[in-house]
Curated annotation (Swiss-Prot):
The gene is F. This is Fusion glycoprotein F0. GO terms for cellular component: host cell plasma membrane; membrane; viral envelope; virion membrane. It is found in: Virion membrane; Host cell membrane. The keyword Transmembrane applies. Residues 32-500 are extracellular. Residues 142-170, 466-491 form a coiled coil.
Length: 553
């Protein structure tokens, strides 16, 4: 028995998973509450589970293209089988030749190996230009060379079996499953029926089914005609080749039914042809599957913004498109490393960015902390559906209720209007008629107004206008400065030298001293003059008194 494929997760990925799991165990994750945000033009459109993955699992599907018919019916179906066999060889021989050229390009000399590989790739590409993806695919094809050789050793036994699904493990380094969609048809139609069929009917049935399968093969390998062996096969193509038997390999590799539908939609399950043998009509495909780690309690929340009415015009909230929350921590999630499906995110790494306190407060329900940008124009869709209801900006469009008839008006200062079946059963918005089935309960906040201070300018045109105003102000300031410089140029520089300034200061001090002394002297003279006046007045009064006394005598 061969060894089973390793499903161990690499150390760097395991470290990432452990860190994320530790964070997720701090506190259960709560999704962002969209009820207080809806009336502010911020709509929570949905959540997705966050998973981390690496493409580390591989298995092989050996597609048995030529079925084995019962001995008593081989002669009846010989003609359609021979035609089918010739068509298969014509269709798939370029694929087989391309695979062999690339695998045989490996030499023991290190210097010429890369050159031979690139030459083999370019030899199989129509335009003569090998892309990075094609070089990567060729390298993977070379790595699978030994496994393909091991499968070819068993080709006779695989071709001889009548089983539609057969697990091949002898001498193989990874799980391999031989499947035959046509063999399944033969077994169901001829081997398990007691009804006798005439030879013509057998030939017709086999011919029709083989033609249908050839059509599927042409659809699958259409892109391979221009660059054989270098294009990945999608999961849909693998199912076309293997039919329902594909599930057997996926189950063996540990893909459960609960993950299968999501992984199929992600495009992470792919296949690469690694061999084609025209003698036995066997086609080997190496299937690559992801190892997926589920991050408990980590969800990605998607946010959409609606153009709202403000006193400064139409504006939209400045919030991230995708955020993730673990406990009380909310951060922006970078989905450029992720593949999205309807319910899941599959990421090679988790990258988050911290948010400003204002945005954090806004997403926590404090709508007065939300900031808005005047970037949305009047042609932006002014409404959004959510859970059977509508959030609309009835300032930008006419919200006409068909049943019951009426116009839904948006009060002055309100950012948006929340419309549900309670207020309108059938709503017409710009020629689009919607039947409402949802309801906004009392927990939804309404009548939210956006203050002027919450609206900022971030649009390119608006910023250009503001920059123009700033440039005008700067130009005016430069003109004033130039005028001031002209006035300063008229000043005699010699009068402003250091020695002249010292002289001016000394002279000023001397002048001040003389001025003070003069003031003191003037005050003294005035005081002395007043004293003399008093003395003369006193002498005059005494003389007058003496004269009066002499007259009386």
């Amino acid at each position: 028995m061969g060894s089973r494929p390793s499903t161990k997760i690499p150390a760097p990925m395991m470290l990432t998973i452990r860190v994320a799991l530790v964070l997720s165990c701090i506190c259960p994750a709560n999704s962002i509450d969209g009820r207080p945000l809806a009336a502010a033009g911020i709509v929570v459109t949905g959540d997705k589970a966050v998973n981390i993955y690496t493409s580390s699992q591989t298995g092989s599907i050996i597609v048995k293209l030529l079925p084995n018919l019962p001995k008593d019916k081989e002669a009846c179906a010989k003609a359609p089988l021979d035609a089918y066999n010739r068509t298969l060889t014509t269709l798939l021989t370029p694929l087989g030749d391309s695979i062999r050229r690339i695998q045989e390009s490996v030499t023991t000399s290190g210097g010429g190996r890369q050159g031979r590989l690139i030459g083999a790739i370019i030899g199989g590409v129509a335009l003569g230009v090998a892309t990075a993806a094609q070089i990567t695919a060729a390298a993977a094809l070379i790595q699978a060379k030994q496994n393909a050789a091991n499968i070819l050793r068993l080709k006779e036994s695989i071709a001889a079996t009548n089983e539609a699904v057969h697990e091949v493990t002898d001498g193989l380094s990874q799980l391999a499953v031989a499947v035959g969609k046509m063999q399944q048809f033969v077994n169901d139609q001829f081997n398990k029926t007691a009804q006798e069929l005439d030879c013509i009917k057998i030939a017709q049935q086999v011919g029709v089914e083989l033609n249908l399968y050839l059509t599927e093969l042409t659809t699958v390998f259409g892109p391979q005609i221009t660059s054989p062996a270098l294009n990945k096969l999608t999961i849909q193509a693998l199912y076309n080749l293997a039919g329902g038997n594909m599930d057997y390999l996926l189950t063996k590799l540990g893909i459960g039914n609960n993950q299968l539908s999501s992984l199929i939609g992600s495009g992470l399950i792919t296949g690469n042809p690694i061999l084609y043998d025209s003698q036995t009509q066997l086609l080997g495909i190496q299937v690559t599957l992801p190892s997926v780690g589920n991050l408990n309690n980590m969800r990605a929340t998607y946010l959409e913004t609606l153009s709202v009415s403000t006193t400064r015009g139409f504006a939209s909230a400045l919030v991230p498109k995708v955020v993730t929350q673990v406990g009380s921590v909310i951060e922006e999630l970078d989905t450029s490393y992720c593949i999205e499906t309807d319910l899941d995110l599959y990421c090679t790494r988790i990258v988050t960015f911290p948010m400003s306190p204002g945005i954090y407060s806004c997403l926590s329900g404090n709508t007065s902390a939300c900031m808005y940008s005047k970037t949305e124009g009047a042609l932006t869709t002014p409404y959004m559906t959510i859970k059977g209801s509508v959030i609309a900006n009835c300032k930008m469009t006419t919200c006409r209720c068909v049943n019951p008839p009426g116009i839904i008006s948006q009060n002055y200062g309100e950012a948006v209007s929340l419309i549900d079946k309670q207020s309108c059963n059938v709503l017409s918005l710009g020629g689009i008629t919607l039947r409402l089935s949802g309801e906004f309960d009392v927990t939804y906040q309404k009548n939210i107004s956006i203050q002027d201070s919450q609206v900022i300018i971030t649009g390119n045109l608006d910023i250009s206008t503001e920059l123009g105003n700033v440039n005008n102000s700067i130009s005016n300031a430069l003109n004033k400065l130039e005028e001031s410089n002209r006035k300063l140029d008229k000043v005699n520089v010699k009068l402003t030298s250091t020695s002249a300034l010292i002289t001016y200061i000394v002279l000023t001090i001397i002048s001040l001293v003389f001025g003070i002394l003069s003031l003191i002297l003037a005050c003294y003279l005035m005081y002395k003059q007043k004293a003399q006046q008093k003395t003369l007045l006193w002498l005059g009064n005494n003389t007058l008194d003496q004269m009066r006394a002499t007259t009386k005598m």
